[in-house]
Amino acid sequence: LTQALCEKLEGRGKVAVLVGTPGAPCHEERALGVRSVIEQHPGMEIVELEYDEDTVEKAYAYTKQLLERHPDLAGIVCCNMSNPVGAARAVIEAGRQGQVVIVGMDHDQEALGYLRDGTIYALGVQDCYSIGFDTVQVAVMIADGVLPGEAYPEKTQETTTIVYQNGAADMLRTLYGVID
């Protein structure tokens, strides 16, 4: 996702990062990934990183503050499911659609609506079925006494699909039955 943002911004601009819960492994790993990608683009800078504790309201409030403190903010990377919604609401309220590029995680219905209308540039949609299936499968193995590394990896890699505006309607239809 961050690479998509960098390409959209042509490797230039100030970027903010919204993260969910401090210490949540997947949120922290995503934030580290954002940093590592941004570091590869000398014309880009992370100006702030904020934790919204997985609330749309805090993501919205932080984004409003970010837009006020950084009127030249070019992009926002959102590391969890609530960030993109809060960021999009604040960007719309500030009249900055098309000026601030938002990328984010997950498939919240409201976020997909913002993707469809172009407020959000791209979303990373996780394969929730596989995540659930793998979790139950590993839980059964653990209950049967199987140790990590024997029949299953200690950590699994799940699929994330990057969805852009042209794929938003299909994703809304598939996940939520929304038909335009």
Regions found by a protein language model. Give the residues of each.
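Short beta-strand elements at the ligand-binding edges of bilobed clamshell
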Residues: 1-4, 17-19, 49, 117-129
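Structured segments of extracytoplasmic/periplasmic soluble domains
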Residues: 4-8, 12, 37-41, 65-69, ...
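Solvent-exposed, acidic/flexible segments
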Residues: 24-27, 52, 56, 77-80, ...
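Hinge/cleft segment of the Venus flytrap/periplasmic-binding protein
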Residues: 18-22, 26, 37, 130-180
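Hydrophobic alpha-helical
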Residues: 33-34, 47-48, 52-114
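Hydrophobic alpha-helical segments within soluble ligand-binding/sensing domains
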Residues: 1-15, 29, 58-60, 107-111, ...
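Glycine-rich beta-alpha junction loops
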Residues: 19-23, 81-83, 106-109, 127-129
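Extracytoplasmic substrate-binding proteins
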Residues: 1-32, 36-37, 41-43, 47
